[in-house]
UniProtKB/Swiss-Prot annotation:
Sequence similarity: Belongs to the kiwellin family.
A matching Pfam family: KWL1
UniProt entry keywords in alphabetical sequence: Secreted, Signal
Gene3D superfamilies in the record: RlpA-like domain
CDD domains to which the protein is assigned, alphabetical: DPBB_kiwellin-like
Position of the signal peptide: 1-25
Record protein name field: Putative ripening-related protein 4
InterPro entries linked to this entry: Kiwellin-like (IPR039271), RlpA-like_sf (IPR036908)
PANTHER family linked to this entry: RIPENING-RELATED PROTEIN 2-RELATED, RIPENING-RELATED PROTEIN 4-RELATED
Cellular compartments per GO CC: extracellular region
Localization (cell): Secreted
Length: 216
């Protein structure tokens, strides 16, 4: 009788262990494996930008070439021989809700880290101007040219600001003088002037923030 009780106890323990493995996924898989798949590196999330890449994937690679790079505002300067991802698209924009993005900092002034003149109007803009650049897909490659249009940028602290789109954060080209010898942009960037950062109440020293933006 005692032997039968022991057998029943062992069987009960085995069932409990099996149930635990199913619920928690064991030591190596289950929930953590799903989480890993969910947060796989995307085309720089910026790639992928905030909120998912919407089917926008890397279209190629640019071979880096180092040069005279203005490192103001934490510029990521090209390294010779390194491969940098290129994107010919951006996450989809919906009129029903704001679009998640990564806000970066850029000077559009002459001699600033923005490189050449703004592509939309052929001008430089002082750091006090409320201006932004958008990743290539959002600026023009999704069929809706946003040059010289106004957008609203909203930060997680409850602040928002209106800014004019004056330039392209080029997601295809880079590592040359025109682009301050910086790599191509991720596909989900709103590159804002110091004035935009100030209006949003954000610390320039952080370098980038998750924000949303929408057409006005």
């Amino acid at each position: 009788m005692a032997a039968n009780v022991k057998v029943l106890v062992v069987l009960a323990l085995l069932q409990l262990m099996s149930l635990h493995a199913v619920v928690h996924g064991g030591d190596n898989g289950g929930v953590s494996a799903v989480a890993t798949g969910k947060h796989e590196p995307k085309p720089k999330q910026g790639g992928g930008g905030g909120g998912g890449d919407g089917g926008c994937h890397i279209s190629g690679f640019l071979h880096g070439k180092a040069g005279k790079c203005n490192r103001a505002h934490g510029s990521d300067c090209c390294v010779t021989g390194r491969r940098y991802p290129q994107f010919r698209c951006s996450p989809p924009v919906s009129s029903a809700r704001p679009t998640p993005a990564t806000l970066t900092l850029n000077s559009f002034a002459r001699g600033g880290d923005g490189g050449g003149r703004s592509s939309c109007d052929g001008r430089f803009h002082p750091d006090t101007a409320m201006v932004v650049a958008l990743s290539s897909g959002w600026l023009r490659l999704d069929g809706a040219s946003r040059c010289n249009r106004m957008i609203r940028v909203a930060a997680g602290n409850g602040r928002s600001a209106l800014a004019r789109v004056v330039d392209e954060c080029d997601s295809v080209n880079g590592c040359d003088a025109e682009h301050n010898f910086e790599p191509p942009c991720p596909n989900d960037v709103v590159d804002g002037s110091p004035a935009v950062w100030k209006a949003l109440g954000l610390d320039e020293g952080v370098g980038e923030f998750k924000v949303t933006w929408s057409d006005v």
